[in-house]
Amino acid sequence: MMMVMAATGLPELDVARIVKYCASRVPDRLRHEIRVECDIALRHVTICECRPPWREDFGPEWTRFPIARLSYTKKTGLWTLYWRDRNLKFHRYQFLAPSPHVQDLLDHI
């Protein structure tokens, strides 16, 4: 089976699956209060919780809080789940082995 890579070097279908996962996390009626979005980089996708500004004088920008990172290793074809600590550093999640199926990681989040 041939795997198509996005411009980032990540499998396109897996990236689409992650984007769809994020969009489905919050019902439409609550999207003005909270959203789940993803930031796509060369070798990983970071899932973020987004909240609107809580004070008008802070501007219109929503606050982004990274909650998980899905890292892809092209050589092995495996996805690995990382969690973020209070110091903004990501650590490998030890309770889930890397998987060739990104859905395995999404099911665990």
Predicted regions and their residues:
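Negatively charged, low-complexity tracts enriched in Asp/Glu with abundant Ser/Thr
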Residues: 1-60
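Short, compact, well-ordered microdomains
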Residues: 76-109
